[in-house]
């Protein structure tokens, strides 16, 4: 994006105000007022940036592109002169992704909203744990049962989760692959920043452990990644069979 102007590039609410947002806190279900706000881009600018990313990846010989928001968040623009509904945006996103896929590039999306399933090669950060509401007795992988064998997916980055072992077991139960988020920089560089969630991302510090986890997982479950899930049963508290 070559420069950003709020009145030109930001999407609009129905009351004609520009869409200015704050990050959402999953712990207390409210806006994080101590964080920096950001503006929601107009739909056409989002699509143009995806196209630019695809062209840049092709220039460098990239095998594919990874998209953080498409497939995860779908927004409208209520600008009275150029109204774009969520349904219109969905159709335009799918058309663009179909074109990228037809060019031979692979596509990785986030979270896994169903409208992108036909054009997605891999989904990251798929929810494997449910809402966690105390009134629920159990979580059942309905979505994963429906799509397993058709598209590959993974839960959270294993090295960044609060409970690595729990996420690993959930991945096995839900037929998910493994996903890691790594960086070359030392974790100490993240101190006193807003990126402390990446403390576990240093490659040198974790490569041996992660390689061992991946090797065992691939050896024991690699042969079933492209098969359908035909049954899922809760045998006892904390014990399931897929």
Question: Residue spans of the language-model regions?
Answer:
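Hydrophobic residues within beta-strands of alpha/beta enzymes
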Residues: 65-67
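Active-site-proximal substrate-binding groove within the catalytic cores of carbohydrate-active enzymes
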Residues: 3-62, 71-242
């Amino acid at each position: 994006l070559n420069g950003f102007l709020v009145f030109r590039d930001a999407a609009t609410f129905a009351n004609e105000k520009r869409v200015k947002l704050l990050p959402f806190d999953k712990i207390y279900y409210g806006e994080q007022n101590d964080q920096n706000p950001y503006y929601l881009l107009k739909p056409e600018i989002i699509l143009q940036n995806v196209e630019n990313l695809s062209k840049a990846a092709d220039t460098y010989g990239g095998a594919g592109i990874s998209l953080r928001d498409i497939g995860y968040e779908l927004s409208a623009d209520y600008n009275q002169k150029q109204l774009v509904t969520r349904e219109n945006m969905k159709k335009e996103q799918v058309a663009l992704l179909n074109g990228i896929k037809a060019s031979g590039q692979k596509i990785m999306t986030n979270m896994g909203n169903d409208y992108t399933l036909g054009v997605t090669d891999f989904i990251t950060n798929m929810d494997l744990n449910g809402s966690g509401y105390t009134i629920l007795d159990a979580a059942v992988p309905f979505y994963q049962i429906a799509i397993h064998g058709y598209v590959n997916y993974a839960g959270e980055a294993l090295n960044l989760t609060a409970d690595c072992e729990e996420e690993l077991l959930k991945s096995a139960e839900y037929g998910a692959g493994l996903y890691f988020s790594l960086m070359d920089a030392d974790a100490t560089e993240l101190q006193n920043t807003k990126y402390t969630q990446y403390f576990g991302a240093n490659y040198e510090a974790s490569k041996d452990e992660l390689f061992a986890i991946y090797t065992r997982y691939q050896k024991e479950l690699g042969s079933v990644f492209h098969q359908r899930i035909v049954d899922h049963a809760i045998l006892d508290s904390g014990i399931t069979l897929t």
